[in-house]
Structure formats: C-alpha cells, structure tokens
Amino acid sequence: MKTVFKLPIIAAAMALLPAAAEAQRTPRTDSAAIGADVGVFRPSEDALDSGLALDGFYEYYTSPRVSLRLGLGWTNPGYEGGGNRNLRYVRIGGDLIHNWEGGTIHPFVGAGLGVYVMEPRHDGDSLADSESKLGGVLLGGIEMFTSNTVSIKAEASYHLISNVDNFGPENPDGFKLTLGLKKYF
C-alpha cells in the first residue's frame, strides 16, 4: 500500500525537475541585470600614469547567450610627474556581449562604441574645455555565479579612443582590468 502512494509522488517530482532547472537558468531571454565594477585603467600614452576605474551598467539579454550593455564609466589617470594634474575620462557607451554556458562560470567577449568625454584637471579644477571623442572597446572576461541572481565578474578591456586635439596627451587609448558585482532581475 505504501508503494502505491510513493510511486505517484516520485513520478511527479521527476516530471517537475526539468521545469525547476529551466526556471533557475540565468541569464535567460528578456532578463536584465545591473552591476558595478572597480579596477585600474592603464593609458597607453607614456605621459599618463595608471588610475582608478569605476563603472556602472545595465545589461539586457536578448537571448541567454547575447546581451546589450549600457554603461557609464569614470577614470582619472594622473600625468606622470605632474603633481595634482590628471586627465578625467567619462565614457557613455553601449556594448554587445556574447557569453558561453559553463555552469557557474560563464566566459564572455564583446565589443562596443561610446562617447568619451575627456578633461584635463589640476587640483580638481578644469584646465581646458572638455573634448568628446568617439571610441570603441574590445572586452572579455569571466562571470562566476554565486547564486541564481548574483554573480562576480572579472573583465579585461582595451579602449580605442580618437586622438585628442586641444590638450595632451594626444593618444588617450588604454587597457582596463576590473572586478565587479552583478545582480539579475
């Protein structure tokens, strides 16, 4: 008699397992995430030192493997030997990201375009008018899921930015390494 009751319960549980696993899959089509990164930006121009990099973003998944990321980034590398002189970068951009399913670890690559607003500063004051330049970014990294809705990510990116006209350094390109936290909803 006990077997008669156990068998339907076991069959129902087995039937629901694939649905439960699919419901937990992240990312999924039409899901979104917000996140923040902190890291270091190393300009390719010798006249600039490395600087702190901060980024915030919103990411929308068109499929489980493809997403569109809109972001705002800030870095402020100092001039080499320049005392309190630095070159502030603000990036407003969009990136196309492709990721691969790897269980709790998802490697990803991407590319994007953005407007980089650059302004030379000294002791927090502007030294010249800012310049807005078009730039691109190539990126890659890994995302490590700590739960179904939270992940930690490590990312490397190279920023290719149009040359600056009115103040130095002329070439503002650079390499950035970041660690971040991402929350899905």
Task: Give the positions of each predicted feature.
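Cleavable N-terminal export/targeting peptides
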Residues: 1-29, 185
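Short, well-ordered turn and helix-capping elements at secondary-structure junctions
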Residues: 40-44, 96-100, 162
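Hydrophobic secondary-structure block in the mid-to-C-terminal portion of proteins
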Residues: 153-155, 159-185
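Transmembrane beta-strand segments of Gram-negative outer membrane beta-barrel proteins
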Residues: 26-42, 107
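Extracytoplasmic loops and strand-loop junctions of Gram-negative outer membrane beta-barrel proteins
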Residues: 38-41, 78, 121-125, 162-164
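Gram-negative (and chloroplast) outer-membrane scaffold detector with strong preference
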Residues: 24, 52-125, 131-139, 144-150, ...
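Solvent-exposed loop/turn segments connecting transmembrane beta-strands
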Residues: 42-52, 80-86, 165-172
